[in-house]
UniProtKB/Swiss-Prot annotation:
This is Sialidase 85-1.2. Residues 127-158, 221-240 are annotated as: Disordered. The keyword Hydrolase applies. It is an enzyme of class 3 (hydrolase). Residues 127-142 have a biased composition (Acidic residues). Gene3D superfamilies: 2.60.120.200. The lineage of its organism: Eukaryota, Discoba, Euglenozoa, Kinetoplastea, Metakinetoplastina.
């Protein structure tokens, strides 16, 4: 359990999958964090992050192992992409549109990791480096805290729209993630009949917790990449 942003967050499992639909309206002027999961209450913090770059590339980083990977697979402006962060044991992975983005990143930590918090855009638990070596210090400054954003940027049209955010208390397979993206029951999708039911979010606490956490991060980081109320739909629609 974690209490923060005046909201009590409850997590039921060390394994998780966080899935969201994102639309990047235009290229940023610099590398920009999109989605981050904080893994455990430790110093320095462990986290897994997905960022998007000015040259339309995806970038992933697993803090704690100094693993920084930039993928050649591009993101497309104004196109809806499904992004997912997944933790299975101590292996972190990122999926884009149901396909793995690079290899799983094993995190060399003795104790099991668990989700401690999530955020969209810049995060207040960012530290002085982004998990790389000294040559990456300039890049880490690009992921600066929102308080360093100029007043002129506040209130401008957001670069990213985030919808359909779901938190699951287990890893999902590619078939299940495609079913979420296509918004159809998994059981109707061929030719993979081994999946009998559609995946369900953590019920009922986790979807509510994710909704509150997302609201808190959007409001707190108004000077960052995302502004205003997050366009999150009714997250209880799949509880039935």
């Amino acid at each position: 359990e974690h209490s923060g942003d005046n909201v009590r967050h409850v997590f039921l499992n060390h394994n998780f999958t966080l899935v969201a639909s994102v639309t990047i309206e235009e290229a940023p002027s610099e590398k920009t964090p999109l989605l981050t999961a904080l893994l455990g209450d430790a110093e320095p913090p462990y986290f897994m992050r997905l960022s998007y770059t000015a040259d339309n590339k995806w970038e992933t980083i697993s803090k704690g192992d100094k693993k920084l990977t930039t993928e050649s697979r591009p993101w497309v402006p104004k196109k809806e992409h499904q992004v997912a962060l997944m933790l299975q044991g101590n292996k972190a992975s990122v999926y884009i549109d149901g396909e793995s983005l690079g290899e799983e990143a094993p995190l060399t930590v003795e104790t099991p990791l668990e989700p401690f918090g999530f955020c969209f855009g810049a995060c207040d638990f960012d530290d002085d480096d982004d998990g790389g070596d000294d040559d990456d210090e300039e890049d880490s400054q690009e992921e600066s805290s929102p308080k360093e954003s100029s007043p002129e940027k506040i209130g401008k049209k957001p670069h990213v729209t985030v919808t359909n955010v779901f938190l699951y208390n287990r890893p999902l397979n590619p078939t299940e993630m495609r079913a979420i993206k296509d918004r159809i029951p998994v059981s109707t999708r061929a030719p993979e009949p081994q999946v009998k039911i559609a995946p369900k979010p953590v019920a009922p606490a986790a979807p509510g917790s994710l909704r509150c956490l997302a609201h808190g991060k959007y409001q707190q980081h108004r000077g960052g990449q995302l502004w205003g109320e997050p366009p999150i739909p009714n997250m209880r629609q799949r509880d039935a």
